[in-house]
Amino acid sequence: MDIRAAEISAILKDQIKNFGQEAEVTEVGQVLSVGDGIARVYGLDNVQAGEMVEFENGTRGMALNLETDNVGVVIFGADREIKEGQTVKRTRAIVDAPVGKGLLGRVVDALGNPIDGKGPIQFTERKRVDVKAPGIIPRKSVNEPMATGLKAIDALIPIGRGQRELIIGDRQTGKTAIALDTILNQKPLNAQPDEKIKLYCVYVAVGQKRSTVAQFVKVLEEQGALEYSIVVAATASDPAPMQYLAPFTGCTMGEYFRDNGMHAVIIYDDLSKQAVAYRQMSLLLRRPPGREAYPGDVFYLHSRLLERAAKLNETQGAGSLTALPVIETQANDVSAYIPTNVISITDGQIFLETDLFFQGIRPAVNVGLSVSRVGSSAQTKAMKKVAGKIKGELAQYREMAAFAQFGSDLDAATQRLLNRGSRLTELLKQPQFSPLKMEEQVCVIWAGTNGYLDALPLGKVRAFEDGLLSLLRGKHADLLNTIRDTRDLSDDSAAKLKAAVEGFAKTFS
């Protein structure tokens, strides 16, 4: 066999001719100046607002200000490596995040990248982080309860699936503890096979210490709650753009469940820090400041985020996304700019007070100032029956307690009312990590409002409650099951409960 050189060279020339012709067209710009996490870029003529751009070292940024002569880009990462004169290229993609069930049990950053060291994420698809909220027609009024497992909230300030309920209070009043207990309370629901019953949880940590977030994730893991939760973390050491973006990323992950006929709850902890990060970005981008130096659109920042929590109607799959935003106040000032904004956007607020917290009333819920504007329609019949009474009695108690400080000679009726009120207040206390099921709460509150605690010394109320619950769980499980399944306290069940409580009260001393 002879090798013909001419033939081989012809073949090689033919192969080489088309090599390296796949040229890539990218629109680029140049960095004019960079500092404080903001880059001014010249060029990038056709860039869209909110588009991802990429710097030479691979760092991503987002185009926010589109001006006549330059583009203001916020940088998602450190700006140390970025120098004046470097090129910036368009990605032609608006900022998006991975969504899907593969994210459950994972901890991610504001861009959806894993930060828990458990390898890459198996996501279903990528979705834009900033999308329009559902309109009026796809929505439905809130009608299913979202149980937190806390007596003070489930009885007095009930939350429904698809509601937005604000948790507001000073630092160290137990705001995150309420959110954490709510996540832990969903464990029995998520153990069931029916997707309509499950409630997936998304926790967004904004501007918190890394140690705090690590502790939170550790508790979730120990309690077996991480498997149905997603944690999005943009900690205090992350750049402001990441802290601004994290709630939107978390919301997109939660919307995946809402739009696929499932249910999710998202906790933004906390939105004050997001507003501060957004203020920092806006001032550095030279946008005009407004009240408290926040930009004019800080209300829109929060309203467009919280409007995405919704209960959808049957034609849309009947899914829901419940939002529990957290706001930290300074010295109980609820009339500051951000707190008033978020109060006006949400469907109610749980107001936590330092004074109550230090008096040992935990959860430190101020029942007088807290409201739930739509949740009562989602309450179970059983809870409605027992909770209506406790609300009135506590309101009367608060009014009387204020007067009782001045006068010592009180008539018997007032004395009885004060006595009952203090015991009900004691009854609503609850230690952390011990959420109660709906039917258990109903029985305990029923015992309180029907006067079975009145004769007890205050210190014995907790012991009475624990004893009653263990008796009901042990010997009257059928009663608890009936209340749970019918979601109602029928006359028959009430009679059984009365017999059980009376029997227990006799033996308890």
Swiss-Prot record:
InterPro entries, A to Z: ATP_synth_asu-like_sf (IPR023366), ATP_synth_asu_C (IPR000793), ATP_synth_asu_C_sf (IPR038376), ATP_synth_F1_a_nt-bd_dom (IPR033732), ATP_synth_F1_asu (IPR005294), ATPase_a/bsu_AS (IPR020003), ATPase_F1/V1/A1_a/bsu_N (IPR004100), ATPase_F1/V1/A1_a/bsu_N_sf (IPR036121)
Catalysed reaction equations from the record: ATP + H2O + 4 H(+)(in) = ADP + phosphate + 5 H(+)(out)
Documented EC number(s): 7.1.2.2
Localization (cell): Cell inner membrane
An example molecular function term from Gene Ontology annotations: ADP binding
GO cellular component entries: plasma membrane; proton-transporting ATP synthase complex
Entry's family note: Belongs to the ATPase alpha/beta chains family.
Known partners and oligomeric status: F-type ATPases have 2 components, CF(1) - the catalytic core - and CF(0) - the membrane proton channel. CF(1) has five subunits: alpha(3), beta(3), gamma(1), delta(1), epsilon(1). CF(0) has four main subunits: a(1), b(1), b'(1) and c(9-12).
Its biological purpose: Produces ATP from ADP in the presence of a proton gradient across the membrane. The alpha chain is a regulatory subunit.
Protein name (record): ATP synthase subunit alpha
Organism this protein belongs to: Bradyrhizobium sp. (strain BTAi1 / ATCC BAA-1182)
